[in-house]
């Protein structure tokens, strides 16, 4: 059908152009137009009658015609016959085409059901179910997001709890260290107090002994040695450290209780939210509240850190102050020890000199008595006695040994020999 259709179009166009060319040569009679062909294609055919021929009876007079050649009538007759045959074929094809279309239409009518089912209700149900599925997916995705947020919040709370727990352990360790330091300082303070008390007792005993020796040696009553220790009462370090320890314990206990209560409340709230998801606004308000709580806890933690730092600085200053005081006391004690050693050496030297002087005094008194007896006239007995005494005195000498000792060691030793005539 398509091939015949294209052929008809081509042939009609060529014949039409031929007729139009001839029409320009002169006036002629045209046959009526013939319409036909498959698909309603118009075919126009124009041909000339013998009256339209030029003078001479043929197209070939005067010039040659490339289409008609010699006999134009026979050629036109041949063309008309061929056209008639072609038109008959076209009509036959049109009839066959119409029959085929009728058969196709009948076949379609036979195959089509008499009653079509109405699927509009099902389509509405399907669209509604699809919308419900989409809504369910959105709600499920929202719930998944809420669950993820809740898990992240729980992880954050667990991390914060672990951090607070580790901080608590660190504070406990520091408090334990401060307690040990306090105990050590208490022991050191007690030892120092005992040493100072012992040295005071020793100083009192030395004063008494010195007074006794001075009384024995007939020293003037106004010769006295007074040693005074000026100690300013300082702060009670044990009480300060005990107050600090109690304050730290109260802070740690309070923070532990607050964190435990807060964690339980948040865990219960998160469990309820996971079991039955609350609205988004409620979750947002809870998140804001938790953030505010977290910020408040951070501020409180920073305050506690600063307070701890201040207490540590105070403890360091207290240690430094008391160490300076202890050094001063040790220097004072060392100075008094040196003075006591010097005083002992002076007393021993004076005692030795006193003994030497007493011996000299005794010998002089004896010599004076002898001279008196000689002057009184007892010449014989006394001269013999005096000569014997003078002979004995020539060989008698008195040695005075003076020693200076520091911390039990002899530093300087002097020997003084005094000859006495008895």
Swiss-Prot record:
Residues 218-240 are annotated as: Linker 12. It comes from Mus musculus. Belongs to the intermediate filament family. The gene is Krt23. It comes from the Eukaryota. One of its GO terms (cellular component) is intermediate filament. Residues 108-125 are annotated as: Linker 1. Residues 72-382 form the IF rod domain. Keywords: Coiled coil, Intermediate filament, Keratin. PANTHER family: INTERMEDIATE FILAMENT, KERATIN, TYPE I CYTOSKELETAL 23. Residues 1-71 are annotated as: Head. Residues 1-24 have a biased composition (Polar residues). One of its GO terms (molecular function) is structural molecule activity. There are two types of cytoskeletal and microfibrillar keratin: I (acidic; 40-55 kDa) and II (neutral to basic; 56-70 kDa). Signal peptide: none annotated. Residues 379-422 are annotated as: Rod-like helical tail. The keyword Plastid does not apply. It holds the Pfam family Filament. Residues 1-35 are annotated as: Disordered. This is Keratin, type I cytoskeletal 23. Residues 241-378 are annotated as: Coil 2. Residues 72-107 are annotated as: Coil 1A.
């Amino acid at each position: 059908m398509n091939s015949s259709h294209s052929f008809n179009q081509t042939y009609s166009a060529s014949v039409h152009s031929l007729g139009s060319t001839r029409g320009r040569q002169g006036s002629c009679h045209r046959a009526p137009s013939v319409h036909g062909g498959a698909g309603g294609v118009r075919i126009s055919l124009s041909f000339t009658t013998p009256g339209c021929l030029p003078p001479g009876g043929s197209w070939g007079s005067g010039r040659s015609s490339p289409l008609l050649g010699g006999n134009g009538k026979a050629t036109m007759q041949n063309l008309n016959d061929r056209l008639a045959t072609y038109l008959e074929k076209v009509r036959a094809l049109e009839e066959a085409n119409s029959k085929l279309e009728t058969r196709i239409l009948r076949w379609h009518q036979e195959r089509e059901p008499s009653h079509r089912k109405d699927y509009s209700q099902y389509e509405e149900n399907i669209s509604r179910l699809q919308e419900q599925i989409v809504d369910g997916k959105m709600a499920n995705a929202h719930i998944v997001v809420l669950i993820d947020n809740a898990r992240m919040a729980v992880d954050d709370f667990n991390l914060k709890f672990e951090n607070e727990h580790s901080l608590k352990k660190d504070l406990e360790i520091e408090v334990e260290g401060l307690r040990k330091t306090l105990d050590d300082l208490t022991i050191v303070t007690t030892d120092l107090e005992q040493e100072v008390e012992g040295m005071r007792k020793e100083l009192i005993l030395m004063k008494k002994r010195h007074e006794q020796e001075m009384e024995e040696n007939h020293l003037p009553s106004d010769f006295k040695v007074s040693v005074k220790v000026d100690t300013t009462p300082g702060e009670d370090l044990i009480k300060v450290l005990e107050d600090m320890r109690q304050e730290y314990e109260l802070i740690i206990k309070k923070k532990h209780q607050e964190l435990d209560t807060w964690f339980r409340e948040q865990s219960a709230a998160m469990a309820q939210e996971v079991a039955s998801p609350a609205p988004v606004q409620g979750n947002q308000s809870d998140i804001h509240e938790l953030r505010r709580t977290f910020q408040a806890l951070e501020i409180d933690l920073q305050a506690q850190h600063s307070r701890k730092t201040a207490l540590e600085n105070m403890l360091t200053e207290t240690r430094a102050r008391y160490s300076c005081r202890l050094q001063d006391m040790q220097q004072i004690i060392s100075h008094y020890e040196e003075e006591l050693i010097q005083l002992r050496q002076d007393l021993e030297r004076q005692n030795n000199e006193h003994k030497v002087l007493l011996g000299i005094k005794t010998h002089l008194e004896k010599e004076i008595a002898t001279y008196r007896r000689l002057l009184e006239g007892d010449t014989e007995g006394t001269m013999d006695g005096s000569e014997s005494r003078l002979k004995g005195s020539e060989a008698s000498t008195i040695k005075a040994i003076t020693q200076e000792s520091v911390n039990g060691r002899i530093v300087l030793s002097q020997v003084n020999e005094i000859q006495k005539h008895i």
